Amino acid sequence: MTRSKTSGSIVVTFLLLTCALFAQDPPPGVGAAPQTTPIYTPKFHGDPARSDSEAAALAYMRVVIRAQRQFNKQYNHFATSLAELVHSGSFTKRMVNSDRGDYTANFKGKKDSYVLTMTPKNMDAQHRSFYAEDDGKIHGDETKPADANSPVVK
């Protein structure tokens, strides 16, 4: 082999090895961005939710509260079950299911009052518990199940 062919082979081999080294993934923790909680984008001006899961839970509560107001106006008493609310306002048959994704809904109704709670499957700063009754105010708590004494969600 001539000297120029040998030099050319060495250069090509060097370039191939360099490309192969740079194409490999870095080991875990090297050059990787730190894992952070995704930033929540509010759904509307004044949105009190801290995550998409909270936004869905609060939206569900607002639908139930509006349906109860409409039901009470029409029948002069509150619905005693979620099934009674079907077709009141925008409350649908599928909404009777208490499994609401990251939350579980609990409804206790009487003709003169009701209590609705949304309990997260894992409570943390982005998954607070929520509570509402017939006054329509939604209360929230990030450390324990929310109740009437918990702060009102703004």
Indicate residue ranges for each PLM-predicted region:
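Conserved catalytic core of two-component sensor histidine kinases
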Residues: L58
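Extracellular/periplasmic head regions of type IV pilus-like filament subunits
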Residues: D25-D52, V63-R69, K73-H127, A132-K137, ...
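Bacterial N-terminal signal peptides
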Residues: S9-A20
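Bacterial N-terminal signal peptides that target proteins for export
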Residues: M1-V11
